[in-house]
């Protein structure tokens, strides 16, 4: 057994002191290493959580836009039908209530469109599209700073959003002539569908 003090003078044995210091240094190194590992794990977990949240919002906004686009497609097709039938005096069970009064066609297609937008059911459908726009806008705000993993997906999503906005806006406030409205609406409709198909590549 080693002596902790000198038998001659009673001073502490330096070998024992060095051994204690060595053990202390090892313990400190282990603690520092453990803290680094825990910190790295924490950063990794936080990064993964942010990626999962981002993906969830990206998926939600993609399907929310699809729902809004479907509503806009239905409304836009009805607008085209009312507009066309009012001009060319075509009878149709779906549009007669807007294009005809007292058994006769209205003199101005604008009157028919006004009747359509004043209709409670159609007005509610337009309100649903506007609500959809609001929900989509709020979700898009949360996606402005994508993780590196989703930067490419966000670029595709922005194009999808632009096409979705054009499609929903033209239905909420139709302008131009029947021909220009129909052409623009069909273009926005097709572009929105194409954008969604591209976006699906980034969704599980």
Predicted features by range, described:
Residues 27-42:
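Hydrophobic membrane-insertion alpha-helices, especially the h-region
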Residues 55-115, 119, 149-204:
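C-terminal amphipathic alpha-helix
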Residues 1-22:
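Cys/His-rich metal-coordination motifs, chiefly Zn-binding "fingers/knuckles"
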Residues 129-148:
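Amphipathic, heptad-repeat alpha-helical segments
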Residues 118-131:
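Mid-length scaffold segments of soluble, non-membrane domains
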Residues 15, 142-146, 170-173:
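General structural signal for alpha-helix termini and helix-helix connectors
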Residues 39-53:
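Sec-dependent signal peptide cleavage junction
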């Amino acid at each position: 057994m080693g002596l902790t003090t000198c038998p001659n003078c009673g001073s502490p044995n330096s070998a024992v002191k060095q051994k204690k210091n060595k053990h202390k240094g090892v313990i400190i190194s282990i603690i520092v290493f453990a803290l680094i590992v825990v910190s790295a794990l924490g950063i990794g977990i936080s990064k993964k959580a942010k990626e999962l949240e981002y993906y969830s919002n990206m998926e939600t906004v993609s399907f929310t836009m699809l729902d809004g686009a479907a509503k806009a497609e239905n409304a836009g097709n009805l607008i085209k039908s009312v507009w066309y039938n009012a001009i060319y005096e075509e009878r149709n069970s779906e549009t007669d209530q807007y294009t005809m009064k007292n058994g006769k066609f209205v003199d101005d297609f604008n009157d028919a469109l006004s009747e359509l937008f004043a209709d409670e059911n159609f007005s509610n459908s337009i309100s649903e599209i506007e609500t959809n726009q609001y929900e989509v806008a709020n979700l898009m705000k949360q996606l402005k700073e994508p993780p590196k993993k989703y930067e490419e997906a966000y670029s595709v999503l922005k194009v999808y959003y632009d096409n979705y906005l054009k499609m929903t806006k033209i239905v909420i406030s139709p302008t131009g002539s029947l021909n220009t409205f129909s052409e623009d609406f069909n273009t926005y409709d097709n572009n929105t569908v194409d954008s969604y198909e591209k976006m699906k590549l980034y969704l599980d």
